Curated annotation (Swiss-Prot):
Family: Belongs to the bacterial ribosomal protein bL25 family. CTC subfamily.
Protein keywords: Ribonucleoprotein, Ribosomal protein, RNA-binding, rRNA-binding
GO cellular component, one term: cytosolic large ribosomal subunit
SUPFAM superfamilies noted in UniProt: Ribosomal protein L25-like (SSF50715)
Protein name, as recorded: Large ribosomal subunit protein bL25
Function: This is one of the proteins that binds to the 5S RNA in the ribosome where it forms part of the central protuberance.
Subunit structure: Part of the 50S ribosomal subunit; part of the 5S rRNA/L5/L18/L25 subcomplex. Contacts the 5S rRNA. Binds to the 5S rRNA independently of L5 and L18.
GO BP annotations listed: translation
């Protein structure tokens, strides 16, 4: 079971481009909280606190957002918008969650063991970066780890080959190809030396 990350938030009274830019210049990230049966709430969180929490707890962490009146919102990050030119987070969307109700969340793959493939002059081709999974918020993994160190040329890894954590399900096609491994051609080997 994951820990819950605590983040302080402030309400946003204006959602204009200029107001959001001013927030970012003052070290805040504009965002929204949304959920079933509620109106979206415009908020801002401190950028450095959010980045620290993501680094410590992971992208799929459960957050407890606390406003200036000590009202708490249990949320998960639904979307992180990154400004392409400066590669910085520019906006956040949080989804209100109940810790006792299953949710659907996108989970990224973390590939380990690539150095073994490189030592065998094998090339890894990743077809899918993430998949949607369902489960209770605290059971959603930060990432799904895939060890490719024992794969050989011609091997494929299908979604059905990945063991999901207990309590986690997915409606992804079991035959979905996640990774393939191939040997480098002679020309590619010569070029890499």
């Amino acid at each position: 079971m994951q820990e819950t990350a605590l983040l302080n938030m402030v309400p946003r009274t204006s959602t204009s481009k200029g107001a959001n830019k001013l927030l970012r210049n003052n070290g805040y990230l504009p965002g929204n909280i949304f959920g079933k049966g509620m109106e979206s709430i415009s908020i801002a969180v401190k950028k450095d606190e959010f980045k620290k929490s993501i680094k410590e707890y992971g992208r799929n962490a459960v957050f407890k957002l606390v406003d200036t009146n000590n009202k708490e919102y249990t949320v998960m990050t639904k979307e992180i918008t990154v400004a392409p030119l400066i590669n910085e987070i520019s906006h956040l969307n949080f989804q209100l969650v109940s810790l006792s109700e299953a949710i659907k969340q996108e989970v990224a793959f973390k590939i380990i063991g690539t150095e073994f493939l490189e030592s065998k002059r094998l090339l890894l081709n990743s077809h899918v970066d993430s998949v949607p999974v369902s489960g209770l918020p605290h059971d959603i993994p930060h990432e799904l780890e895939i060890d490719v160190s024992s794969m050989n040329s011609g091997d494929s890894l299908l979604f059905k080959d990945i063991k999901l954590p207990e309590g986690i399900t997915s409606d992804v096609d079991p035959e979905l190809k996640i990774i393939t491994v191939k040997g480098l051609k002679r020309q590619e080997v010569a070029a890499s030396e």
